[in-house]
Regions:
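N-terminal glycine-rich "phosphate-gripper" loop used for MgATP/nucleotide binding
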Residues: 78, 98-106
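Glycine/serine-rich phosphate-binding loop and adjoining beta1-alpha1 elements at the start
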Residues: 1-18, 54
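Conserved Rossmann-fold cofactor-binding substructure of NAD(P)-dependent oxidoreductases
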Residues: 78-91
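Rossmann-fold cofactor-recognition segment
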Residues: 67-80
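Hydrophobic/small residue at the entry helix of a nucleotide-binding pocket
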Residues: 31-34
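NAD(P)-binding Rossmann-fold cofactor-contacting core
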Residues: 44-65
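Conserved N-terminal Rossmann-fold NAD(P)-binding element of oxidoreductases
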Residues: 24-29
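Rossmann-fold NAD(P)-binding glycine/threonine-rich loop
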Residues: 107-115, 123-160
Length: 174
């Protein structure tokens, strides 16, 4: 059966699950822009419980696509000194973070989520912007293999934490 463009313009979509918590989408680049409609179409969720938080300014695009939907839009840069406070404003135990951003340290965010009972899906394993790969002297320590090992070791401290999923493949790269 062929799918036509009109099939994507449906007014009603099948709902696959209900989520009563809050969802924080960090980043509103290509992945954030793609995931928000999926959430709104296929989850039973109050749109007021969904927040998009980003450093860049895609507000005009957000308003064009989601004005009146009830979804919250916040422009704020997440840094090593403010991430706990800023993220804590929008999610707590039982809630979900979808991190589709760049330059937010995956290990820091995962540890915060584990400590606070927040589920997380992360598109990639990033480091803080001020700590790029080039600042790491040993080449082997710059690899994803090494970073995965660091993440696994850190998560051993939280054997019963909420579900955390990293590098799930939705990172479009450059």
């Amino acid at each position: 059966m062929a799918i036509s463009f009109k099939d994507f313009k449906k007014e009603k979509y099948e709902k696959y699950a209900e989520f009563n918590g809050k969802i924080l989408i960090i980043g509103y680049g290509s992945v954030g822009q793609a995931i928000l409609p999926v959430i709104l179409r296929h989850l039973v969720i109050d749109p007021k419980n969904v927040t998009v938080l980003e450093r860049d300014n895609h507000r005009a695009l957000f308003i064009k696509r989601h004005a009146g939907s009830g979804v919250n839009y916040v422009r704020e840069e997440i840094t090593p000194s403010n991430y706990k406070k800023e993220i804590g404003k929008y999610v707590s135990e039982g809630d979900l973070i979808i991190n589709a951003s760049l330059n937010i340290d995956a290990k820091s965010l995962l540890e915060w989520c584990a400590e606070n009972g927040v589920m997380e899906i992360d598109t990639s394993l990033e480091r803080w912007e001020h700590n790029p790969d080039e600042t790491i002297p040993k080449l082997a320590d710059r690899t994803l293999y090494h970073t995965h090992g660091v993440i696994r070791a850190a998560m051993e401290e939280y054997p019963n934490c909420a579900t955390l999923c990293v590098t799930h493949g939705a990172n479009p790269g450059y």
